[in-house]
Amino acid sequence: MTRDEIVAIFQKTGAMLSGHFRLTSGRHSNRYFQCALVLQHPDYSELLCRELAARFAGDGISVVIGPAMGGIIVSYEVARALGVRGLFAERENGVMTLRRGFSIEPGERVLVVEDVITTGGSVREVMEAVRKSGGTVAGAGVLVDRSNGAVDLGVRTEALLTAEVVSYAPEDCPFCKQGIPAVKPGSRKI
């Protein structure tokens, strides 16, 4: 898929939002990628995640995992495309962990996926959970990298769409200074 084709899907589904947003990282931005609006469409989910999976097809991946919430559908669809298990990690007492009977065997090659990254914090937390389980993090895949490739996760990282989106510390946010309230559209409470 070309970048233009991917952008067209995000635009068609209304997933590229403008306004004043408080991101999961705690930073503020005037743009937000609401991947749930794309992922609600099974055909688009399959198409995008198949493209992401293809980038790791020869890497011997045996498990795909993503953080709840944003990574659940991505994990499932990428795993399906690769023909492997798809898991998700979730927070328990504030720590990303494997629950619900999910496990990773020592030495399994694991691909960590997410819908959007800004700082990579959630992906790093899942990577730590994988390592604690004895798995080997073989790579990371995301639908959207808001950092335009600036985030270094320490493993090969593939993004379907990279975008340089300005974000601000809350104390430096021009929208806050104008009194414009921030919206928190994501799933994680901060």
UniProtKB/Swiss-Prot annotation:
Residues that hold orotate according to the record: T118, R146
Named cofactor requirement(s): Mg(2+)
PROSITE patterns given in the database record: PUR_PYR_PR_TRANSFER
EC numbers: 2.4.2.10
Keyword set, alphabetical order: Glycosyltransferase, Magnesium, Pyrimidine biosynthesis, Transferase
Positions contributing to 5-phospho-alpha-D-ribose 1-diphosphate binding: E114, D115, V116, I117, T118, T119, G120, G121, S122
Gene3D superfamilies xref list: 3.40.50.2020
Domain of life the protein comes from: Bacteria
Pfam family of the protein (one): Pribosyltran
Biological process, per Gene Ontology: 'de novo' UMP biosynthetic process; pyrimidine nucleobase biosynthetic process
Alphabetized GO MF terms: magnesium ion binding; orotate phosphoribosyltransferase activity
Pathway: Pyrimidine metabolism; UMP biosynthesis via de novo pathway; UMP from orotate: step 1/2
Catalytic reaction annotation: orotidine 5'-phosphate + diphosphate = orotate + 5-phospho-alpha-D-ribose 1-diphosphate
Family of the protein in this entry: Belongs to the purine/pyrimidine phosphoribosyltransferase family. PyrE subfamily.
Record's function text: Catalyzes the transfer of a ribosyl phosphate group from 5-phosphoribose 1-diphosphate to orotate, leading to the formation of orotidine monophosphate (OMP).
Subunit structure: Homodimer.
This protein's name: Orotate phosphoribosyltransferase
Source species: Pelotomaculum thermopropionicum (strain DSM 13744 / JCM 10971 / SI)
UniProt gene name: pyrE
